[in-house]
Amino acid sequence: MDADKSPIDYEDFFATLAQNVGPEHVITDKTALSPYGKDIYYESKPPIAVVRPGTIKEVCSTVQTITAAGLCLSARGGGLSYSAGYLTDRQDCVTLDMQRLNEIIEINQDDMYVRVQAGVTWNQLNDALEPLGLRTPFWGTGSGLFATVGGGISQNAINY
């Protein structure tokens, strides 16, 4: 946070996040936040909140709320990273958990591409492609079929 900004009213901030995505999709309880400060191998500081958007509109409004407050933002796929991919050492970070964004938007058999949301798992994608006699040229990340496509693509992208 910049020195010239006034302190954040976290109660209002969390209420705005809840308006963006629904209160059931905002986690602020310290015990519930603890797993979001860890991956399979590393441990860091837990975020101050986890937000689970379910639509692109919810992602946009949530990102706007977080950036307007001057806080750190980290995106998380399935939480199966083993290289600190979504972890941060900052005290003021909000994590976007992308698992609710799990729609396969398009499978284009002619041009051989798919369009998926970030929370689609490699297993989910494989299951959708298999009846068509198709598959991806790889099976996802080393953390397995239940890792998300968005998480796999974003691997090592923190701070970029």
What do the predicted segments below correspond to?
Residues 17, 41-73, 98-140, 155-160:
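N-terminal glycine-rich flavin-associated loop
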Residues 34-35, 58, 81-84, 122-124, ...:
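Flexible loop/turn segments at secondary-structure boundaries
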Residues 1-40, 65-73, 78:
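N-terminal accessory segments
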Residues 52, 83-102:
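Structural signature of FAD isoalloxazine-binding scaffolds in flavoprotein oxidoreductases
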Residues 79-81, 142-155:
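Conserved A3 ("GATE") glycine/threonine-rich loop of ANL adenylate-forming enzymes
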Residues 14-22, 80-86, 129-133:
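Short, mixed-charge, low-aromatic patches
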Residues 10-14, 122, 146:
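Alpha-helix initiation and N-capping motif
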Residues 41-42, 88-92, 152-154:
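Short low-complexity, flexible loop/linker segments enriched in glycine and/or proline
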